[in-house]
From Swiss-Prot:
The keyword NADP does not apply. It comes from Candida glabrata (strain ATCC 2001 / BCRC 20586 / JCM 3761 / NBRC 0622 / NRRL Y-65 / CBS 138) (Yeast). The keyword Cytoplasm applies. This is Topoisomerase I damage affected protein 2. It is found in: Cytoplasm; Cell projection. Transmembrane segments: none annotated. CDD domains: DLC-like_TDA2 (cd21457). Belongs to the TDA2 family.
Length: 112
């Protein structure tokens, strides 16, 4: 098994990085709604661009604490365009009581 670290993670993208950013920003400007709807619109746009790829879109929403509240709420949404019979996704939360942290571990698999 060969493991390769690449600094530019968009080098093999079906869209250039600036074009992909424009697509995401335009869908956000048009939808300005829930994370689920944003995911759906981004996936639809990507699928129209190229059907040769499988796409995974994850949206993590973080409520910024206010002066009256020091707590932070985090919400994550996930959407994908794939073959549901062959591909899948699993998220599992690990509670680290000693460190006082939770670790969210996500695994996605896509058939070739």
């Amino acid at each position: 098994m060969v493991i390769e670290k690449i600094d530019d993670k968009s080098s093999n993208s079906p869209l250039t990085a600036p074009r992909l950013i424009d697509l995401i920003e335009s869908q956000f400007s048009e939808s300005q709604v829930s994370a689920d709807t944003l995911i759906q619109h981004i996936l639809e746009s990507l699928n129209k661009h190229s059907s040769q790829y499988k796409y995974i879109v994850s949206v993590t929403s973080i409520d910024i604490p206010t002066e009256s509240s020091s707590s932070c709420e985090i919400d994550n949404k996930f959407g994908a365009s794939w073959n549901a019979k062959k591909d899948g996704f699993l998220t599992h939360v690990l509670e680290d009581k000693h460190a006082g942290k939770n670790h969210v571990v996500s695994v996605a698999w896509l058939s070739k």
